[in-house]
């Protein structure tokens, strides 16, 4: 059971980061128009999320995100002994994903990003992005994996545009994107603040979810 879940989370997380980073590199290679680059990156990520969640939901629940796993544990959706399995798979999968994306475009496997994303406003944006993601997942969870997949995909698509952080909303993805000096990269100087914001956003969502949404 653990092996099955590890593999599901690992593959899903790897493909998620390949989609995010790879589409960003492709867009960067094809145009210098920032809006067009972001649009291409957005569409690929939204489409990828929908397919990945639908494909892997029955294997592991398709978290691909330590913040999601944390909230799933606190709402008794997964057992304590699965936390390490999930989070390790997510981190390792995301790291493999960024290396493969870099490799496919003939870039160094690992290259620290120089893309600075500073500011308290961005911290708040990332907190809001993660809060919204968790809230939407639990708002649609009882409607089935297709509903969750569609909701998450369209929310992240919107999040790329309405948040100044471009809605990472995922600590494992934020960490992985430190290792690509391309359109979707983030400087290691800013990664910790993103991760802290994401954890706070997830915990705030958990608090609200327990008040207004049945988690049984």
Give names to the regions the model predicted:
Residues 1-216:
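Membrane-interface helix-loop junctions and terminal tails of multi-pass membrane proteins
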